[in-house]
Amino acid sequence: FYLIDFYQLSPVDAAQQVGFAMMSSAAASLAIQYTVVQKARMTKEGMIALSLPILAIAYCMLFLHETLYVLYVAMACMGLGMGMAYPSLAAAATTYCTPSQQSTITGLITATPAMGYIFGPPLAALLYQQNIALPFGIASALLSVTTCLVFIALKRAAPKH
């Protein structure tokens, strides 16, 4: 709907552009998975520290963009961030808990995307009525705050020398 409203595209043209945007996100996610996540010697904390700002920037780009090309770059950034964030957050969450909590934590991590699919669309629809780009701006702000909180938590959890 965003592409129809913002770019005045027909439903068919909007669907094609959404498909290309999603493909750019998926390609970036796969690329980062097969390169950095699988082969780089980054710690999970390092990947978290890199991926969350990338996601915040991606949402900010979606909020501010004015051309489809910037939208595609933003979606590629989204794929890079998600491709690093999800596995590193899952690994960190299970590492920092007791063995008896690991199955519960893994279940919560697995359920988190489903909660986003349940609560995200109605909340985004409310924001969309105020300003069609507002859901992206709010997501960027929330990710920025989350990034700061995670940096603080990682700094506190870092071993002291």
Where are these regions (language model features)?
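Short amphipathic helix-loop junctions that connect adjacent transmembrane helices
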Residues: 1-17
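Loop-to-transmembrane helix entry/capping segments in MFS-fold secondary transporters
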Residues: 15, 97-109
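Transmembrane alpha-helical cores of Major Facilitator Superfamily
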Residues: 20-23, 27, 76, 107-115
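Helix-to-loop junctions at the C-terminal end of transmembrane segments
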Residues: 31-44, 128
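Structural signature of the two symmetry-related core transmembrane helices
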Residues: 46-61
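Helix-loop junctions at membrane interfaces in 12-TM secondary transporters
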Residues: 63-74
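Intracellular juxtamembrane helix-capping segments at the cytosolic ends
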Residues: 84-97
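Symmetry-related core transmembrane helices of the 12-TM Major Facilitator Superfamily/SLC fold
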Residues: 135-152
